[in-house]
Amino acid sequence: MNIFEELKARGLVFQTTDEQALVKALTEGQVSYYTGYDPTADSLHLGHLVAILTSRRLQLAGHKPYALVGGATGLIGDPSFKDAERSLQTKETVLEWSDKIKGQLSTFLDFENGDNKAELVNNYDWFSQISFIDFLRDVGKYFTVNYMMSKDSVKKRIETGISYTEFAYQIMQGYDFYELNDKHNVTLQIGGSDQWGNMTAGTELLRKKADKTGHVMTVPLITDSTGKKFGKSEGNAVWLDADKTSPYEMYQFWLNVMDDDAVRFLKIFTFLSLDEIAEIETQFNAARHERLAQKTLAREVVTLVHGEEAYKQALNITEQLFAGNIKNLSANELKQGLSNVPNYHVQSIDNHNIVEILVAAKISPSKRQAREDVQNGAIYINGDRVQDLDYQLSNDDKIDDQLTVIRRGKKKYAVLTY
């Protein structure tokens, strides 16, 4: 099975320009290719991971990746399938975000070894050197307005309005391909399926300005089995930055993937072989309640993104919280595991009686209910049941001198901080 056949088998090929020519190029020698990442935030997220891992698969097959950070295009804003104009960021912000994204990409691509080691480029380096007049004369003349308006990404914005700034975005992305081909002999661009219009602007410019053929391959935008856009948890993006989405939160995200999606996601998001995945699928279908596919997915992706130690910590947090063993976890681990739990900051002047604290922290709705909860054995402090109405919180209840975990019943948690 050649690399293109494997990508197809994993569900990673959505659309290509001349497929036969692309397969020929990939099987006959080393291909230099690029994927672009606009710095629209200070971190990449799970939505970017499909293209990143596809790029890594091609590198493992001997091809040479260029990771393009869009320091210039990030200043403009991509209109593709957006309902409204993006807010423009300052140059300083975009350059800062660009540096952070460069650091994240080095986790996945090999920038050190071999003749196909990855290269980082930033399109701000060339766009900052081109005058507006030169750009119009040397690049703009190759694009008709009719051609630019025929793109689906633009059509959807015509009625609501699109600025010239965003309208010109596709020309800038097209010029990226031309520049990388001219300087580094890059002949293939990889990106999300929503980028098809912008990407083919590059092959068009190559053909007209340099009389060369370029290839484009898009990866699918991933949705779950209900058709919902994949990569968000509770409406929030799942970030690759551990400070924005903790390894534990990422682990839980993958653990909660639906049965109908789990095996498909193993093919897309892990480097397990297709034979290994087929074996997991057989075991998974025989005992779905054991969630083997989800557990494997969580292990593989968290290890890939954050490392083995982070995976082990996420697994330990999961197991200890499930067992109610709060005291077996550090304050930092509890902050990860209980990040979505209500917090109450205890002041030194507060009454530290258990009943008062339960009401103040909104664990129990009233003092009467709080007393009943304590007497009925429904209240736990750091995993230990408390039934004494006169119980006073003390330093002994602080984990690492930072927090106390209170549980009411089986599932209602609150974290007290000091």
UniProtKB/Swiss-Prot annotation:
Enzyme Commission (EC) number: 6.1.1.1
Catalytic activity: tRNA(Tyr) + L-tyrosine + ATP = L-tyrosyl-tRNA(Tyr) + AMP + diphosphate + H(+)
Organism, as annotated: Streptococcus pyogenes serotype M1
GO annotation, biological process: tyrosyl-tRNA aminoacylation
Protein name listed in UniProt: Tyrosine--tRNA ligase
Residues the record lists as binding ATP: 232
Subcellular location(s) of the protein: Cytoplasm
Domain S4 RNA-binding residue range list: 352-418
Motif ('KMSKS' region): 229-233
Organism domain of life: Bacteria
Any matching Pfam family: SYY_C-terminal
Binding annotation for L-tyrosine: 34, 169, 173
Gene assigned in the entry: tyrS
